[in-house]
Amino acid sequence: MRHYRISDQNPIKTKRLILTPLTAKELAALETLEQDELMRGALGEMRRNVVEYPDRALWHTGWQISLKKGGQAVGLLGFHGVAVEQTVELGYDIFPQYRKNGYCAEAIRALCDWAFRCEGVYFISVLV
């Protein structure tokens, strides 16, 4: 089985964006700052799964979406675990002030391209 460790993954770059997988420490920092209870719970679950399953961490962590120009974080996306029946689920959140710029579609395309190059992934379900 191929390992999907955070330390082995270079950021994914698109024309305007950089997607960077977050470490457990980074997830913990975001979790303490998050105001929304539902999102705080999701960040906590990601952090716990990254620690518990380090060889599959890229399927459990959040990927920060940042602008190439200026480095500003504009959102977060990530998978909801490893593939089940050759399918992974993908969720996302673009911060309100950055919506309607096409960042979400660009980030989803890039992360889906990465996932389809991984062994055992044939389908991706995107959760809105």
Predicted regions and their residues:
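GNAT-family acyltransferases
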Residues: M1-E89, I94-Q97, A110-L127
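Glycine-rich acyl-CoA binding loop
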Residues: G102-A105
